[in-house]
Amino acid sequence: MMIKQETIGYMTLKSDAAKIEALLTKQFDALCLSQCPIIEEIIDTQLFGFTKEVDFAKRVRLISDQEGSQLVNELETRINQLYLEIYQTQAQNEVHRN
Protein backbone atom coordinates (compact mmCIF):
# COMPACT_ATOMS: atom_id res chain seq x y z
CA MET A 1 0.00 0.00 0.00
CA MET A 2 1.38 3.38 -0.99
CA ILE A 3 1.11 6.31 1.41
CA LYS A 4 0.52 9.77 -0.05
CA GLN A 5 3.30 12.33 0.35
CA GLU A 6 0.81 14.65 2.07
CA THR A 7 0.17 12.02 4.74
CA ILE A 8 3.89 11.46 5.26
CA GLY A 9 4.45 15.22 5.56
CA TYR A 10 1.69 15.59 8.15
CA MET A 11 2.88 12.56 10.14
CA THR A 12 6.45 13.87 10.10
CA LEU A 13 5.35 17.25 11.45
CA LYS A 14 3.23 15.59 14.17
CA SER A 15 6.28 13.55 15.16
CA ASP A 16 8.48 16.66 15.24
CA ALA A 17 5.93 18.45 17.43
CA ALA A 18 5.96 15.51 19.85
CA LYS A 19 9.77 15.61 19.94
CA ILE A 20 9.72 19.33 20.73
CA GLU A 21 7.20 18.76 23.51
CA ALA A 22 9.33 15.94 24.96
CA LEU A 23 12.47 18.08 24.77
CA LEU A 24 10.78 20.99 26.51
CA THR A 25 9.36 18.66 29.18
CA LYS A 26 12.88 17.45 29.98
CA GLN A 27 14.16 21.02 30.08
CA PHE A 28 11.28 22.13 32.30
CA ASP A 29 12.05 19.28 34.68
CA ALA A 30 15.71 20.29 34.81
CA LEU A 31 15.24 24.05 35.17
CA CYS A 32 13.46 26.12 37.77
CA LEU A 33 11.09 28.25 35.70
CA SER A 34 10.78 31.06 38.20
CA GLN A 35 14.56 31.40 38.42
CA CYS A 36 15.50 30.71 34.82
CA PRO A 37 14.24 33.26 32.27
CA ILE A 38 16.15 31.45 29.51
CA ILE A 39 13.32 28.90 29.34
CA GLU A 40 11.15 31.38 27.43
CA GLU A 41 13.94 31.79 24.88
CA ILE A 42 14.11 28.02 24.48
CA ILE A 43 10.35 27.83 23.93
CA ASP A 44 10.40 30.69 21.42
CA THR A 45 13.29 29.13 19.50
CA GLN A 46 11.62 25.73 19.29
CA LEU A 47 8.28 27.20 18.23
CA PHE A 48 9.95 29.44 15.65
CA GLY A 49 11.78 26.49 14.11
CA PHE A 50 8.64 24.37 14.04
CA THR A 51 6.65 27.21 12.48
CA LYS A 52 9.24 27.53 9.71
CA GLU A 53 9.11 23.77 9.14
CA VAL A 54 5.30 23.93 8.87
CA ASP A 55 5.50 26.92 6.52
CA PHE A 56 7.82 24.99 4.24
CA ALA A 57 5.50 21.97 4.23
CA LYS A 58 2.60 24.26 3.29
CA ARG A 59 4.58 25.89 0.47
CA VAL A 60 5.45 22.54 -1.10
CA ARG A 61 1.84 21.41 -0.56
CA LEU A 62 2.56 18.54 1.80
CA ILE A 63 -0.09 19.93 4.14
CA SER A 64 -2.92 22.44 3.84
CA ASP A 65 -2.91 25.88 5.44
CA GLN A 66 -5.56 24.64 7.88
CA GLU A 67 -3.50 21.58 8.86
CA GLY A 68 -0.43 23.75 9.35
CA SER A 69 -2.27 26.19 11.57
CA GLN A 70 -3.75 23.32 13.54
CA LEU A 71 -0.33 21.74 14.11
CA VAL A 72 1.20 24.99 15.35
CA ASN A 73 -1.80 25.81 17.56
CA GLU A 74 -1.82 22.32 19.08
CA LEU A 75 1.88 22.52 19.94
CA GLU A 76 1.52 26.02 21.40
CA THR A 77 -1.44 24.88 23.50
CA ARG A 78 0.38 21.80 24.83
CA ILE A 79 3.48 23.83 25.68
CA ASN A 80 1.42 26.51 27.43
CA GLN A 81 -0.43 23.87 29.45
CA LEU A 82 2.82 22.17 30.40
CA TYR A 83 4.45 25.47 31.35
CA LEU A 84 1.43 26.45 33.46
CA GLU A 85 1.33 23.09 35.26
CA ILE A 86 5.02 23.24 36.13
CA TYR A 87 4.86 26.90 37.13
CA GLN A 88 1.89 26.22 39.44
CA THR A 89 3.67 23.24 40.99
CA GLN A 90 6.76 25.33 41.62
CA ALA A 91 4.68 28.16 43.08
CA GLN A 92 2.96 25.72 45.44
CA ASN A 93 6.32 24.30 46.48
CA GLU A 94 7.56 27.83 47.23
CA VAL A 95 4.50 28.51 49.40
CA HIS A 96 5.05 25.28 51.34
CA ARG A 97 8.72 26.11 51.91
CA ASN A 98 7.90 29.50 53.40
Swiss-Prot record:
Signal peptide: none annotated. It comes from the Bacteria. InterPro entries: UPF0358 (IPR009983), UPF0358_sf (IPR036270). It holds the Pfam family DUF1507. Belongs to the UPF0358 family. This is UPF0358 protein LCA_1078.
